[in-house]
């Protein structure tokens, strides 16, 4: 796909004013673009860095058209906008990311089927539409397995682990509320992710392979480069995905590595991703920089240089008191506080990145600081 390059001073619209929208806006502004953001929250983080703010729900057709009329290009920071609404916008306005990826990825079953058809390695799964399908899941997958809702859910929401017959009731409860997908539970050795930007004329730029750790289904930390030799294999899997899903901009593919060292595609995030935040300080281009380059039709860098290894830590509400006490003693901490008005213990309130020559030691230091609050 090829489209005209946006000139400096043009206006970029962002659907979604959370931290991802804020960091997109900051990258856009340093490149000379104006930013208009649409978000239902009057005090969303992006509002305070955007040139203009439209407060409206994501399904407000009048407001979305207002955004389109004000902007030369539109992008979005998350995948929870209506795919049908996005399709209608794409017919009238310049939205390089398109709607196709959103349409596929909002449905976990369609996502799994698309990944499998693309030739990537995915965890065995089956569709679960009603409670009687659980018997088929037990027969096909065996214990343990995970039941996930087909639609919605993030940071571990909308899923239950079925270890044995005693857990089946929780699975039945979930199926009563939504159609689901059942997946074989893996004995996971490591989680990694690969952030990629696809630009004008199908130019592809890869970031370093990222090693991730989750706590309570929320990303806890990312280490770059990943301490496992899976980069070539991950790139091979991503290239298969790129051939199957239309998308322009930055996206991330999450992988599981099991106890047999097998790499499985877990899911795709069709936008900049939490595990790529380290790139703001640790790389010559951040994931937000390359996203803006892509959606404005600019050329991408041929490769991304990792300037220094890094450890990125998510900061939840419960971490902020500790952070305030420690921050002045650690000038090596690159701190990002998102500006969310409501603080909750398990809500992502910011992140910090530490550039280091010894990621193992830095990881231990971070554990010593934050282990007690997690």
From Swiss-Prot:
* ATP-grasp domain mapped to chain residues: 112-296
Task: List the PROSITE patterns.
Answer: ATP_GRASP
Give the signal peptide as a residue range, or say none if absent.
none
Q: Tell me the pathway.
A: Purine metabolism; IMP biosynthesis via de novo pathway; 5-amino-1-(5-phospho-D-ribosyl)imidazole-4-carboxylate from 5-amino-1-(5-phospho-D-ribosyl)imidazole (N5-CAIR route): step 1/2
A single GO CC term for this protein reads: cytosol
Q: Which Gene3D superfamilies match?
A: 3.40.50.20, ATP-grasp fold, A domain, ATP-grasp fold, B domain
Q: Which reaction does it catalyse?
A: 5-amino-1-(5-phospho-beta-D-ribosyl)imidazole + hydrogencarbonate + ATP = 5-carboxyamino-1-(5-phospho-D-ribosyl)imidazole + ADP + phosphate + 2 H(+)
Task: Give the EC number.
Answer: 6.3.4.18
Question: Which residues does ATP bind?
Answer: 108, 148, 153-159, 183-186, 191, 214, 266-267
State whether it acts alone or in a complex, and with which partners, per the record.
Homodimer.
Q: Which family does it belong to?
A: Belongs to the PurK/PurT family.
- Protein known as: N5-carboxyaminoimidazole ribonucleotide synthase
The species this protein was found in? Staphylococcus aureus (strain MSSA476)
The organism that produces this protein has a lineage beginning with: Bacteria, Bacillati, Bacillota, Bacilli, Bacillales
Q: Which gene encodes it?
A: purK
